[in-house]
Structure formats: C-alpha cells, structure tokens
A protein has these predicted regions:
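Glycine- and hydrophobic-rich flexible loops that cap the catalytic core of alpha/beta enzyme folds
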Residues: 1-198
C-alpha cells in the first residue's frame, strides 16, 4: 500500500504558510507547489495519490480552515458573500455526516478516521493525540487555522475581513500551481514517480 501516514511537521507547515504569505504579498507571483502523481484505477473508479500526498492533505486542511473562517464570518455578520465562499469551498472538501459520506480525499487506513474527525470539526482541537500522524494532522489544522484567523483578525470591519480571507483564497486557488500527472496503470505511475524523484 502506497498511502502513507501524514508526516509534515511544524517546519513544513510554516514553509507552506510562508509561501502562501509571499504569494499574497506579490500579486504577480506564481508559486510552484510541486507535483502530484496519481494512479487512476478505472476498475474501482478511484484515484490514488502516488506522489504529493502530504501537500494534498495539507491543502485540504488549509481549504477546511478557510471554509470555517468564511462560515464564522457569515454566522457572526450575516454577510452573504462569506456564505457563498463557504459553500464553494465545501465543494472541494466534500461532506461527511450520517446522511452524506462524500469526502473528496480519503487517507490511509491509519489516518482516515482522524482526518474525517478533523475535516468535520468546527475548530481545531487543543487535545494532544497519542498517535504521531494524528498529532501532526491536529497541529497542522491548529497552526493553519490560527494563522489565517490571526492575520484577518485585525481587519476593522466585515468587508475588510472578507478581503483578507479572499487574498488567501485567491493566492492559493489562482497562483499556487502543481504539476499534475495521471496514469491508468499503476506501474506507469510508479515509473513517473521514480523518474521525477531521481
């Protein structure tokens, strides 16, 4: 099984946030976020990430954090543009409830239960996890959420806070670029992965 546990530590998360901040600060900047190599298993109609798992998981944690901040802004102010952005972001993440189990990213067996708990949480947990990869997911969510929240907290009114969140949204969705490669044969996906990482 090539689905690995989540391994990004604080320094990788900080690098991600620094890259995001640099991209926000320079509107003409494009940030190359690495490569994603995928095996598209046509039999199971499932796509398996061979290379780029860590950045994909971190991206989903970022998107969920942003989604919650838009949602919180809407609930506290009834500012409708925030609600529209929250709905848009929920399309990226998917849904997970008793009625709807359609998350768009499923992690390794070891991490998926905690990831579901994280991606459906209303806020990051302060309770330390005993499993190392779960603790890394918890810390990533807490760090990213608190970073975005604190950077947009100073915004003096609703529209300024919305502008702040939108800056991060646009930097990530419009100017973070990945090289995406998909293969229908598993062997081909691994050859591509090995060639790119040689």
């Amino acid at each position: 099984n090539y689905q690995r546990e989540y391994s990004w530590e604080e320094n990788e998360i900080q690098d991600f946030l620094n890259d995001l901040e640099d991209t926000c600060a320079n509107p003409s900047t494009i940030h190359f976020f690495g490569q994603i190599v995928v095996h598209n298993d046509e039999d199971s109609q499932t796509k398996f990430i061979i290379d780029g798992q860590q950045r994909t998981i971190t991206s989903m944690i970022f998107v969920h954090s942003l989604q919650l901040l838009y949602e919180n802004l809407y609930f506290t102010t009834q500012y409708h543009p925030a609600s529209k952005k929250e709905v848009l972001l929920s399309n990226y993440v998917g849904e997970y409830s008793d009625e709807e189990k359609s998350l768009h990213l499923i992690l390794s067996e070891a991490d998926n239960p905690y990831f579901i708990q994280t991606i459906t949480a209303r806020q990051p947990s302060d309770s330390k996890e005993t499993k190392k990869s779960w603790e890394r997911i918890r810390k990533a969510f807490k760090t990213i959420y608190e970073y975005l929240d604190s950077h947009c907290q100073d915004a003096s009114d609703t529209s300024k806070k919305m502008d702040c969140l939108n800056r991060y949204f646009e930097a990530f969705f419009e100017r973070f670029k990945v090289m995406y490669i998909e293969a229908t044969k598993l062997e081909e996906a691994f050859i591509i992965f090995e060639t790119l990482n040689a």
